[in-house]
Amino acid sequence: MNQRILSTLGFDKVKQQLLQFIVTAQGTNEVSELLPIADENKIQSWLNETQDGLKVQRLRGGIPIPKLENIQPHMKRIEIGADLNGIELAQVGRVLSTTSELTRFFDELSENEVDFERLYMWREQLEVLPELNRQLKQAIDDDGYVTDEASPALKAIRQNIRRSEQTIREELDSIIRGKNARYLSDALVTMRNERYVIPVKQEYKNIFGGVVHDQSASGQTLFIEPKQILEMNNRLRQQQIAERNEITRILAELSAELVPYRREITHNAYVIGKLDFINAKARLGKELKAVVPEISQANHVVFKQARHPLLNPEKAVANDIVIGEEYQAIVITGPNTGGKTITLKTLGLLQLMGQAGLPIPVEEESKMGIFTEVFADIGDEQSIEQSLSTFSSHMTNIVSVLKKVDHQSLVLFDELGAGTDPQEGAALAIAILDSLGAKGAYVMATTHYPELKVYGYNRAGTINASMEFDVDTLSPTYRLLIGVPGRSNAFEISKRLGLDNSIIEAAKQIMDGESQDLNEMIEDLENRRKMAETEYLEARHYVDESAALHKELKEAYQVFFEEREKELQKARKEANKIIAEAEENAETIISDIRKMQLESGQQGGVKEHQLIDAKTQLSQLHHEETKLAKNKVLKKAKEQKKLKAGDEVIVNTYGQRGTLLKDNGKGQWQVQLGILKMNVSEEDMTPVAPQKEAKPRVTTVRSAESSHVGTQLDLRGKRYEEALAEVDQYIDAAILAGYPQVTIVHGKGTGALRTGITEFLKNHRSVKSYEFAPQNQGGNGATVVKFQ
């Protein structure tokens, strides 16, 4: 980009705004070197960095970077063997400590899974030097003062200095506060030539002896070092020399420590400067209420609600500026003072800012193009130095532009063709626009020539525009109206200001018919635009209202669905809890019956297989999480069929099959669910067809009346499910028979059956213990079970 256009459009002023947010010397260099470029990949990288900066600004208030000086000269000096002073070492130390702090800052963001496009790349380039950082912090404070902790020797020397100073002060205090005080000009202790002295009146200079170091301007006071403290001052001076030598040694040592790491330190300062620059761009974006634009792959410019960045964001009027989609040339017509030039500059400056990677004051989803050059001929940059006329000045610039322009250029012309005969000027303006159009350039031009209003209608890829004017307030609104050519509004303004209506009508008659028709056409277009805008706003209102209603209904449905599922789940859990309690009670009752049979010696009570069947049916009552309540077919069948005793139904709450016993009235029925009898509402039942009678089940365990139960159960060759069912029945029968222990033979095989039996025995309430059989009785191919 040529330097002239940057100044014309105000890019340098934007850089000055950016500098306000820079805190490091390297960051200042970044701003100074900032220029718009045309490399898409590099621009995208810059914009990504700006987006990252805005994200940090939003999440953490910005990147924590303190004020840092330029340390590059320091690194060059130590490279040639020079030593740094305390202030310079402190500046290097701040770079090292900032490096550590930034590393921790970005690591914390990474741990919190905050994503960035580019910032983590810069963080990876920071080289933390903890030991060097520790040494500098310990030895040098922020002001460059060498601390007592820099070395044990320095600490001891300074302790001696403080003691010597205390002794000297005490001695001098005794002099100035004793009987000799009358010989002094003032009762104070001061310093001359780095030695402690007292102010003695001229006439008493021999009273104290010692050395005269200075006298007052009047000569009436001599600053004397009394002989009593000569030796003390000498000793103090020696200690101060020792301190200076030790400090020099420490500074040299620390400077030497930096030499091997000078490249890392220099690069750290460079990276911190980059981060400072990114941070400043984000802070500028926040102040301007700016966003990062997208790069248009079709090279279109779509700036939504664009504002000029150098105007007060609270007062600047925002406008939509679009060029490149349906048209590549915008001709803004109409009178001066309406904001045409500002609109022109806004387009150019925002495009330059975007190509420099800066945020721009537009709405989200705005798009920028990429131009190899931006050219401008603005009315307020006439060449007074060259004593050229307005027309000559403009034409000189235009000739230069036409020689360089191509299809990747953005051209901005203010008052094209002005400064000469209107007819000739308008003709030249049209010819220049045609020439630019033939080269494929993107153009925005302002003019007050009426001939160019027609041009916007007749040329493909060109559109008229104007700046809105409020006739009621007689002031411009600064709103850009695309598609509507401008008009002077002279008749309307004159009428509102009180000009006689007959004069206005006479003026209209004088005005040629073609111009009058054009103005009427423009007025009609403007009225149509206002109507379309009103209709659009109404339609937008209805669309927004519908979208809000849709969102509310969707959320309400989701809440309803979730609440319904919660209630169903709650009912299932409650049902399972009731059945679990019933099962536990049934188990206790069955156990008690067995004990009573054993104690009484009765063998003809309840048959064993009946007890087992009852327990199995009870277990089957556990509620499966079915969706029977949603089955519309079953619901319809229930409504069509009248219920009667003996019918089979599904109890919806539990999802289990049962048989109706009797009608309790009021829509309530007694239902047999396995071994349980329950009262159930008709609404909670769905009629089903009766099940076919199942074939009698063959079991290996029989009641005490009909079969003898052995002390050993052989399961070899049985399927897994069949074997476990048989074990369950066998254990119950063996307990009923009164056996203290039994043996279950399962074989070795793959171990699956053995594992399953072990799990079953582990959870059986009547089993006391179990273990594999002795080796001579089957080993791990059989399990010995002992009962309670």
From Swiss-Prot:
Residues engaged in binding ATP: 334-341
Tagged with keyword DNA-binding: yes
Pfam families in the cross-refs: MSSS, MutS_V, Smr
Root EC class: hydrolase
The organism's place on the tree of life at top rank: Bacteria
Xref: InterPro entries: DNA_mismatch_repair_MutS_C (IPR000432), DNA_mismatch_repair_MutS_core (IPR007696), DNA_mismatch_repair_MutS_sf (IPR036187), MSSS (IPR046893), MutS (IPR045076), MutS2 (IPR005747), P-loop_NTPase (IPR027417), Smr_dom (IPR002625)
EC nos: 3.1.-.-, 3.6.4.-
A GO molecular-function descriptor: ATP-dependent DNA damage sensor activity
SUPFAM superfamilies attached to this UniProt entry: DNA repair protein MutS, domain III, P-loop containing nucleoside triphosphate hydrolases, SMR domain-like
Domain Smr per the UniProt entry, residue ranges: 713-788
Recorded coiled-coil stretches: none
Disulfide bonds: none
Gene Ontology annotations of biological process type: mismatch repair; negative regulation of DNA recombination; rescue of stalled ribosome
Signal peptide: none
Stated role: Endonuclease that is involved in the suppression of homologous recombination and thus may have a key role in the control of bacterial genetic diversity.
HAMAP family the UniProt entry points to: MutS2
Record text on subunit structure and interactions: Homodimer. Binds to stalled ribosomes, contacting rRNA.
Name of protein: Endonuclease MutS2
Natural source organism: Enterococcus faecalis (strain ATCC 700802 / V583)
Gene name in the database record: mutS2
